[in-house]
């Protein structure tokens, strides 16, 4: 399989789009209505580079939760910061609820930058959490995506 064809196949279906709910522990302007604020976590799924989720200025750690009606299996997590406002995230982790209903960490990382694709073992869950543990300023993310790579043999 050619490289371009393989990439197109791996990133063809964003499983995060199948989420029935996305929420955040803090959203700028959420005291009004999280769903209506310009900085809603929904911005992570809208495909528009210039829309983004962010927290209030004083909040430098936060959690984003994706909930699915049915369990999803993935092994690639794409995170993207809105770089026009600067690279801010210094440390993050990805948590899921496992088959026993226990929350566990499946990946950890430092900076995200323009785009970070986190490689994991195949994971099946109906609840996924992106936990921003530390940031230089309020985190500003504009994309969250999940993929299942069945082509390459690369694992973490």
What kind of feature is each model-predicted range?
Residues 1-70, 74, 82-88, 147-156:
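Disordered, acidic Ser/Thr/Pro-rich linker "stalks" and the adjacent N-terminal cap
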Residues 57-62, 72, 83-152, 156:
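Trp- and acidic/polar-enriched beta-sheet ligand-binding modules for extracellular glycan
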